[in-house]
Regions:
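Extracellular distal adhesion/interaction modules in secreted or cell-surface proteins
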Residues: 24-199, 205, 215
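Initiator methionine at the very start of the polypeptide chain
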Residues: 1, 23-24
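C-terminal segment of classical bacterial N-terminal signal peptides
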Residues: 14-20
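Long, compositionally biased interface segments
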Residues: 197-228
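Bacterial N-terminal signal peptides that target proteins for export
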Residues: 1-7
Length: 228
């Protein structure tokens, strides 16, 4: 009986510890439900088999500015970066990459693509209209120099500086969001069918508003490594 109790207690403690490991950190911004849209945790679980906090690669442990936020090219060939789900504003969305400037207020931005589209809950349920159609002249690949770079998105309807993978750049460039600059949640890309991680591939949930549902634009970036 005593051994059974010890075993049961060990299992319980292991379960609690596992749940704690996957829990939201103390300083992590809260993620809001999607307004009449799929919630971010549901998107991650159903499309990638990912845990919203358990698989998060840039959790806020102390300050947003201390989180991993830059990438480096992983191998031969171009880097690809494109939106895969569009749940934000239907005004024109833009995205691209940047090199950190001499100061945080001066990122060297390069635009790659734009689109004016919004997916529906039905699109995600039926896997239709995915990825969103890009505007003419858009590109999803680029050849960065051999140094760390960041990613960004923006929306024309907001008329601000956009949001960046580095929170400190958001705080410096975007006055509207300066007090809540953590706007990108970064994850490994997992193939749902096999359960295996896709090498050098990441999923990013972007937020460019203040409600922090983190699925305004969901992007995939390939042939990169996250700089820790």
């Amino acid at each position: 009986m005593r051994r059974s109790l010890v075993t049961a207690l060990a299992l319980l403690l292991g379960t609690v510890a596992g749940r704690a490991a996957c829990a939201q950190t103390l300083h992590q911004p809260k993620v809001a439900p999607g307004p009449r849209e799929p919630d971010w945790d549901v998107v991650l679980k159903t499309r990638y088999g990912l845990s919203m906090f358990g698989d998060l690669l840039n959790p806020v442990k102390t300050t947003p500015q201390s989180t991993p936020a830059l990438f480096r090219k992983a191998g031969p060939g171009p880097v690809t970066y494109r939106p895969v789900i569009a749940l934000g504003l239907e005004t024109v969305n833009r995205g691209g990459w940047y090199l950190p400037g001499s100061d945080v207020k001066s990122p060297d931005k390069h635009e790659l693509w734009s689109y004016k589209f919004k997916n529906t809950t039905e699109d995600l349920a039926k896997n239709t209209n995915l990825p969103p159609p890009l505007a003419e002249g858009s590109s999803v690949s680029f050849a960065p120099p051999d140094q760390p770079f960041g990613l960004w998105i923006s929306n024309d309807g907001l008329k601000d500086g956009g949001v960046f993978s580095q929170p400190q750049v958001v705080a410096a460039v975007n006055e509207r969001l300066a007090k809540q600059p953590y706007k990108a949640m970064i994850y490994p890309n997992r193939d749902l069918a096999t359960g295996r991680l896709v090498p050098h591939s990441y999923i990013i949930g972007w937020e460019y508003s203040t409600n922090d549902d983190f699925q305004d634009v969901v992007c995939q970036v390939d042939n990169v490594e996250l700089v820790e």
